[in-house]
Design a protein with these regions (language model features):
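Single conserved hydrophobic/aromatic residue that forms the stacking wall/gate
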Residues: 420-425
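Intracellular loop-helix junctions on the cytosolic face of multi-pass helical membrane proteins
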Residues: 1-9, 138-139, 166-320, 324-330, ...
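C-terminal ends and interior cores of transmembrane alpha-helices
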Residues: 84-104, 381-400
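Glycine-rich segments within core transmembrane alpha-helices of 12-TM secondary carriers
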Residues: 58, 144-163, 185-188, 345
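Short amphipathic helix-loop junctions that connect adjacent transmembrane helices
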Residues: 30-46, 317-338
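Hydrophobic core of transmembrane alpha-helices in multi-pass small-molecule transporters
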Residues: 103-124, 399-419
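Central cavity-lining transmembrane alpha-helices of secondary-active solute carriers
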Residues: 52-69, 343-356
């Protein structure tokens, strides 16, 4: 409990803001695939494709949103407008679930809602955590505890969201999904109001300077200027060259992925953007050689992390459908909503978060702690074993017979130990 005391009040504002925003995201995710299949009557393949495209863009847009915040907007503006767009998205989802009698309108409202959620997430997610570090002096011993508190808020929101939104929306009646989306929308609106009304009271650096207003790139440039550190500049010829490179690369990738994903232009756009945007950032002439090399290393690590998150995000799609259709959820005569399984992740992380650091500390004292890449490899191995675990449980299942929830619970437990194992690398 002592670790919770002695922190700037701004940390608790960020804690509350992140808790509410993660409630919004995970609440919507808990019921989304069920809404698509049970209310909008998409077949499973189409619903999974929509979910996959949505999730892919949710992970892609922070790359752009972080760049915009760093170069132009600043963190405060990005957090505010990100939350506003997500609130609009959630209320559009509510409207979609309220107009099921008009299928075409419901579909368009759903797609519009997803668009706003994607854009809002891109602005919000990469920026809010950056505020935590700016509340403290470099090297402050309280910083580790501060990030622990911050991520605890993330887990509180992601734990409560499936329970509440699932209770309201995942009832078996397609018309009730709207209440789950409404709850998520209200929490996002709460995020907007809370952050906007309290930011000027609590978000200050130890020196008393307001944080998150000036874009980091401009602030660092001003500091470098004071320290006589120069950054390279792009001349007109370099800008034209970079424009040609990006144009040609985009055209080639669109043609290539268009051939692979015939007719699926969302996937074509996602895969193209996943390559073009990283290249575009590397071509930024204001980057120093050291900054560019660090970004390149991040890209290499990110390539392998993609496989982890591709399997991890099955929680919102195939695993939720499996929970709904193939899992016996009866508990003493009461059937647990399928969406509630998504609360197991944050529940297990709270428990295991106290175990994994001790394991690494134990190994470190004996000079046996593996390197960060090795930890990631172990994490991917554990993730694959988790899916093998559930395969063992369902391999003999016959049509019409549901399997015990112990198999899905075991998979979620393994997934969470996997995530803690990998995330500790950072």
């Amino acid at each position: 409990m002592s670790a919770l005391k002695g922190h700037p009040k701004g940390l608790y504002l960020i804690f509350a803001t992140s808790t509410a925003e993660r409630f919004s995201y995970y609440g919507m995710r808990a019921i989304f695939i069920l809404f698509l299949t049970q209310a909008l009557l998409f077949d499973k393949e189409a619903a999974a494709s929509i979910y996959g495209s949505y999730t892919g863009l949710v992970y892609l847009t922070p790359l752009i949103g972080g760049y915009i915040a760093d170069k132009y907007w600043g963190i405060r503006r990005s957090v505010f407008w990100g939350a506003v767009m997500m609130a609009v998205g959630q209320f559009l989802m509510f409207m979609s679930a309220s107009t099921l009698n008009n299928t075409e309108l419901a579909h368009w409202l759903m797609y519009g809602g997803l668009g706003f959620l994607i854009l809002g997430n891109g602005c919000f997610k990469p920026t809010v955590s950056s505020l935590v570090g700016q509340l403290y002096e470099p090297g402050d011993k309280r910083l580790d505890a501060a990030y622990t508190i911050f991520y605890m808020g993330v887990n509180v929101g992601s734990f409560a969201a499936p329970l509440i939104c699932g209770y309201l929306g995942d009832t078996g009646d397609p018309h009730d999904f709207k209440w789950g989306f409404l709850a998520a929308g209200i929490m996002t609106l709460f995020t907007v109001v809370l952050f906007e009304t309290q930011k000027n009271k609590y978000l200050f650096s130890p020196s008393g300077e307001a944080i998150g207003i000036i874009p980091d790139a401009k602030r660092e440039k001003k500091e470098d200027k004071a320290d006589h550190i120069s950054h390279p500049k792009m001349d007109a010829r370099t800008k034209i060259r970079n424009l040609i490179i990006i144009t040609v690369l985009t055209a080639v990738l669109l043609a290539f992925f268009g051939y692979i994903f015939t007719g699926d232009w969302i996937s074509v756009g996602i895969f193209t953007a996943c390559i073009v945007f990283p290249v575009l950032i590397l071509l930024d002439g204001s980057l120093t050689k050291i900054e560019r090399s660090r970004i390149f290393v991040i890209y290499i690590v990110a390539f392998f992390v993609i496989f982890f998150w591709a399997a991890y995000e099955q929680a919102g799609a195939s695993l939720t459908l499996f929970a709904s259709e193939r899992t016996n959820r009866d508990i003493l005569g009461w059937e647990m909503p399928a969406s509630w399984f998504q609360s197991f992740n944050p529940l297990f992380v709270v428990v295991l978060a106290y175990i994994m650091p001790g394991v690494w500390s134990f190994l470190n004292k004996r000079k046996m702690e593996p390197s960060s890449p090795t930890k990631q490899a172990i994490g991917l191995l554990l993730l694959s074993l988790g899916y093998l675990f559930i395969c063992f449980g369902v391999k003999d299942a016959v049509p019409g017979v549901k399997v015990s929830m112990i198999w899905l619970t075991g998979l979620y437990l393994d997934r969470k130990s996997t995530r803690l194992n990998s995330s500790h690398c950072s």
